[in-house]
Structure formats: C-alpha cells, structure tokens
C-alpha cells in the first residue's frame, strides 16, 4: 500500500532542502495508521515508465511528483500528467503543501514549447497545467501561462486545456491575460474554509480567491470554472456548506473535495480522516446547490480524472441548457 508517494527519491536533479521555512516549526502529530479506504496502487507499469521518461527528457516538472500525489500511478499509467510550469520552487509556504519553498529560478522561456511537445508526444486529449506561486514576477506568471496555452494549441490543436492557477494576488491585469488565452477550464483552489486560512494558507486571502473565480466568468462565461478543497484539517461541516454557497455565488461550475494527507511531520496535522459516507453527503449537497459537477471522495484531487470530468462538464452544461433552448 502506498499513500503519499516519494517519487523524488531517485530524482537526478540537485538536492536542496525541501522545506527550509518549516524547519523551525514544532513537529506536528502524525497519524500512525491510515484507514482502509485510503489505498492506492504503487506505480511501476510500462506506461508509467514511458510517461516518466518523456517528462525527464524534456526537463519538465509535474505536480504529480512534486506534491506527492497518491494518484500518480493510476494517472501516469493512463498517460495523464499535470505539468507544473515556472519551476519547482514556490514563493509561498502553505502548511499543507509538499512543493518546496524558496527563491525561484528565472523563467525558462522555452518551457511552453517543451510542454506542448510533451503533450503532443503523449497524445493527450486533455491536459492540466498548474504552477507554483511566483510572487516575485510582475504579473505572477500570467504571460507564461498564456504562452503555454498558445503553444499547446499550436502543437496539439485537438487537446483541451485546463489550468490550475495561483491567486495572482496584487497582480493587476494578470487574470485578464490568462483568460484572454481561452483555457477550456479555469481552476483555482480555495483549499480550505476561511477560518483555517491563517494556519493552512497564510499567504492567501479567501475572498480574493472567490472573487478571482467570479471574475473569470464575468470576462468569459464560456470558460468552465472549478475549485477544490481538502477536508480533515479541522473544518466544521457548516463551514464547508458556506464555502459551497460562496462558490455558487461566484458561478463556479465544478467542485472537488478530497482528504488532506500530511506530507511530513512539519506540515499541518491530519485532524481526522473523513469517512466515505461524509464525502457522499457533501457531493449530494453540492449538487443540490447547483454545481454542474462534483467529485468528492477521499482520494479526489484537482486533476484526478480531469479528462473524463471535462467530458462530463460539457454534457452537464448541455443538459442544463437543453430545456431553455427548447422552451
């Protein structure tokens, strides 16, 4: 059984202290045993190895590896990968995240074409592009996102593009640049309920993130919007329901809810493992509140089954519009 996978242990890249900003923090409690419902297959298939080879050959970074995603074996076996642009070093230090923190390197201006070439070689029908936070850049990396989307459109015109962005806090005009590139899905994760932001996501602002998602719809109503949260961080059910209402007020289409898994003893503790029946209850409630699509399971992650979910999103929108069109 594998839960949080250390796929970086054989990484040929130079070793750096992964979380220097967390070194001074007291150790957090670590759950000795994970419940039976959190089980994943360890990676190692031929398709997984081929996907890894293409990623390595192009010198690319994937959030699948950097964040220790438990679904990497399943996704890479299907040749699904979430590419992380603008380097592997984040300017923020969220208490839940396994991505390293520090001063990032300069942007690789050839990266958009490298990503696009990999997408074409993997034959991806749907690709997810995410990034570290780049508060050091004037536009937060918005133009780099736009160039990456454009490069994928040129190299693989049939591929739909989903982006998972940072919040572009205090980066005027950045969001407009990204939306103008016309991704098919715009995802920005709230991550947790507002009461937990100071301890879980201290560099962000909850209502700024909600407004970011709302603004995407105002700029281009055709773009699907999506957001995700983790549970098991000490949130209350009523707080999660209020978060759903906040997202619906921003006209967000798709909500993902998954179990938080602790990357190390220096990260936020797992307050509890939420049982599958509670995830099902969240899913039922979210659909009742009007989301087009909801994915709520212990192993749900933002990019998990993203291609299949995009097809389901399209079908859900069409079903919603059909009665109005026939009236």
Swiss-Prot record:
Predominant place of localization: cytoplasm
**Pfam hit, one:** Radical_SAM
InterPro entries the UniProt entry points to: Aldolase_TIM, Elp3/MiaA/NifB-like_rSAM, Lipoyl_synth, rSAM
Cofactor binding mode and count: Binds 2 [4Fe-4S] clusters per subunit. One cluster is coordinated with 3 cysteines and an exchangeable S-adenosyl-L-methionine.
Native source species = Methylobacterium radiotolerans (strain ATCC 27329 / DSM 1819 / JCM 2831 / NBRC 15690 / NCIMB 10815 / 0-1)
EC identifiers of the protein: 2.8.1.8
Record-stated family: Belongs to the radical SAM superfamily. Lipoyl synthase family.
What protein does this entry describe? Lipoyl synthase
Ranges for the Radical SAM core domain?
Answer: 76-292
Q: Keywords on this record?
A: 4Fe-4S, Cytoplasm, Iron, Iron-sulfur, Metal-binding, S-adenosyl-L-methionine, Transferase
């Amino acid at each position: 059984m594998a839960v949080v996978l250390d796929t970086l242990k054989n990484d040929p890249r130079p070793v750096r202290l992964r979380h220097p900003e967390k070194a001074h923090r007291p150790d957090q409690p670590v759950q000795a045993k994970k419940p039976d419902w959190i089980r994943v297959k360890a990676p190692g298939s031929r398709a997984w190895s081929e996907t890894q080879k293409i990623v390595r050959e192009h010198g690319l970074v994937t959030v699948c590896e950097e964040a220790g995603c438990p679904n990497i074996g399943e996704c890479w076996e299907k040749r699904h990968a979430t590419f992380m642009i603008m380097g592997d070093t984040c300017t923020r230090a969220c208490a839940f995240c396994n991505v390293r923190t520090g001063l990032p390197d300069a942007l690789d201006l050839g990266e958009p074409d490298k990503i696009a070439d990999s997408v074409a070689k993997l034959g991806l029908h749907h690709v997810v592009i995410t990034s570290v936070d780049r508060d050091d850049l004037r536009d937060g990396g918005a133009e780099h996102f736009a160039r990456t989307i454009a490069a994928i459109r040129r190299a693989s015109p049939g591929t739909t593009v989903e982006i998972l962005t940072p919040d572009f806090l205090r980066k005027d005009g950045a969001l407009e640049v990204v939306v103008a590139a016309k991704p098919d899905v715009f995802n920005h994760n709230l991550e947790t309920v507002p009461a937990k932001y100071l301890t879980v996501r201290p560099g962000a602002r909850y209502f700024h993130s909600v407004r970011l998602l709302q603004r995407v719809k105002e700029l281009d109503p055709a773009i699907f919007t999506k957001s995700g949260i983790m549970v098991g961080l000490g949130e209350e059910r009523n707080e999660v329901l209020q978060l759903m209402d906040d997202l619906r007020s921003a006209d967000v289409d798709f909500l993902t809810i998954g179990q938080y898994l602790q990357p190390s003893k220096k990260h936020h503790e797992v307050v509890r493992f939420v049982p599958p029946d509670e995830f099902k209850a969240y899913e039922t409630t979210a659909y009742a509140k009007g989301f087009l699509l909801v994915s709520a399971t212990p192993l749900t992650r933002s990019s998990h089954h993203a291609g299949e979910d995009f097809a389901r999103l399209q079908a859900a929108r069409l079903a919603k519009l059909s009665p109005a069109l026939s009236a």
